[in-house]
């Protein structure tokens, strides 16, 4: 009887402790398995290999209308008026930046010149002959040593500035005289957008701030989820009707009512636990045609999102942090590995892929990354980290020329008044 009792108890023990999924032994195993799974998901992602598609497809771009009009509040540059001779005709000089690894700042282009800044945060206005009209600096001696980087925008007769040392201010565009100056709690890390009475910028705390154009007083602020990682790219903003829409460091896209500062909708695009490990996450700028928002990132995601609701229209697998360009029913972008993608705007279908790095040897192309694109007429201009600019015939997709424009780092190309500009460290070069 005792033997039978012991046997029954032994079997019962095994059932409850060894084979039951609810037992501690099983839980520990399951927990260990889950940990291993998470590690694999974060660190062992598969990299998509890009190949060319429909190389023989010719695009009908005969109805493209090029212009100098830029829908600045939508970041929608389209095809601009530029003949593409690539003859150097001007050089706007400034003191070089220290320890720079990217030139992701934009000059302000005027009909009679341009405005930019130098290594100490001095704002410089040039005329069309590269002559300095005025130069002004509104930083203390200690602040100049921090090498402030400025984001600039024009509002009427005034220039609005937000920088990476937490200052924002306004100067007269004709004289450089200071109108007002204020400080924020955190440095800014975004472009600036403005409407008639407000301007907007996002700081490193992922907080969108709305300021009064006339005196710099804060109208409202909206903080989104913070990240422990320092972002590798600037945040982006667009304004559509009564909404300001922006991205932050963790990939959230948020639409906010301009007057109240209340959220209309928010779209998370990344899982936060993955982002904590992927410190090099980069989003492209947001671009809109008024109905949809287009953007991509370096995690093989290209999005189209409905402006009104924030719902996803489509997602395609393209890894790129370059600002896409919309022309008619087509969207153009270049992937991190140098492939030009042409997509249908409404469906997201890729209709052609062309290798723009085809003339580089395999070892060389692994070290090169695209910086930015511009489209002039039916030609695409792509700058790269090796200081070269690749010129592409968009109709056929073939490379027609390669120009050396800098020793190494350069900016994306900018087109204005039938001229092309690129920023090198120490100068802005103008081509006709």
Language model segments and positions:
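Beta-strand-rich domains and repeat architectures in extracellular enzymes and scaffolds
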Residues: 49-120
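WD40 beta-propeller blade core
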Residues: 124, 169, 209, 254, ...
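Surface-exposed loop/turn positions within WD40 beta-propeller blades
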Residues: 120, 129, 165, 205, ...
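Extracytoplasmic beta-rich repeat domains
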Residues: 63-66, 88-108, 132-156, 177-196, ...
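Bacterial Sec signal peptide processing site at the extreme N-terminus
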Residues: 11-46
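Short loop/turn segments that connect beta-strands within beta-propeller blades
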Residues: 127-131, 172-176, 212-216, 258-261, ...
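Loop/turn-rich, solvent-exposed surfaces of beta-rich toroidal or solenoidal domains
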Residues: 326-327, 333-343, 349, 353-392
């Amino acid at each position: 009887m005792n033997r039978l009792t012991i046997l029954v108890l032994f079997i019962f023990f095994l059932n409850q402790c060894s084979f039951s999924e609810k037992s501690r032994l099983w839980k520990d195993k399951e927990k260990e398995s889950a940990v291993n799974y998470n590690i694999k998901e974060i660190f062992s992602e598969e990299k998509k290999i890009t190949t060319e598609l429909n190389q023989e497809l010719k695009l009908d771009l005969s109805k493209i209308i090029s212009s100098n009009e830029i829908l600045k509040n939508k970041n929608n540059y389209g095809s601009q008026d530029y003949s593409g001779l690539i003859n150097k005709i001007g050089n706007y000089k400034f003191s070089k930046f220290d320890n720079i690894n990217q030139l992701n700042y934009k000059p302000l282009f005027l009909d009679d010149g341009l405005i930019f800044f130098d290594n100490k945060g001095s704002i410089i206005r040039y005329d069309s002959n590269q002559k300095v009209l005025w130069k002004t600096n509104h930083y203390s001696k200690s602040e100049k040593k921090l090498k402030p980087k400025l984001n600039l925008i024009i509002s009427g007769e005034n220039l609005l500035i937000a920088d990476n040392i937490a200052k924002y201010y306004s100067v007269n565009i004709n004289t450089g005289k200071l109108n007002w100056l204020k400080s924020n709690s955190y440095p800014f890390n975004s472009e600036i957008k403005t409407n008639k009475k407000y301007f907007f910028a996002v700081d490193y705390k992922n907080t969108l701030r709305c300021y009064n154009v006339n005196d710099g007083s804060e109208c409202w602020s909206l903080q989104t989820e913070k990240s422990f990682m320092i972002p590798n790219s600037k945040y982006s903003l667009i304004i559509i009707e009564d909404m300001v829409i922006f991205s932050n460091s963790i990939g959230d896209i948020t639409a906010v009512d301009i007057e109240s500062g209340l959220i209309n909708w928010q779209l998370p695009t990344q899982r936060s636990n993955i982002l904590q490990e992927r410190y090099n996450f980069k989003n492209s700028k947001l671009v809109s045609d008024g109905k949809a928002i287009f953007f991509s990132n370096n995690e093989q995601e290209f999005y189209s999102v409905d402006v009104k609701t924030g719902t996803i229209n489509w997602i395609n697998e393209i890894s790129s942090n370059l600002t896409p360009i919309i022309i008619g029913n087509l969207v153009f972008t270049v992937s991190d590995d140098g492939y030009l993608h042409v997509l249908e705007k409404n469906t997201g279908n890729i209709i052609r892929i062309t290798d723009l790095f085809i003339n580089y040897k395999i070892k060389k192309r692994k070290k090169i990354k695209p910086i930015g694109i511009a489209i002039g007429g039916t030609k695409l201009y792509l700058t790269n980290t090796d200081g070269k600019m690749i010129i592409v015939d968009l109709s056929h997709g073939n490379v027609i020329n390669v120009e050396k424009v800098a020793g190494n780092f350069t900016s994306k190309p900018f087109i204005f008044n039938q001229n092309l500009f690129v920023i090198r460290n120490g100068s802005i070069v103008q081509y006709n």
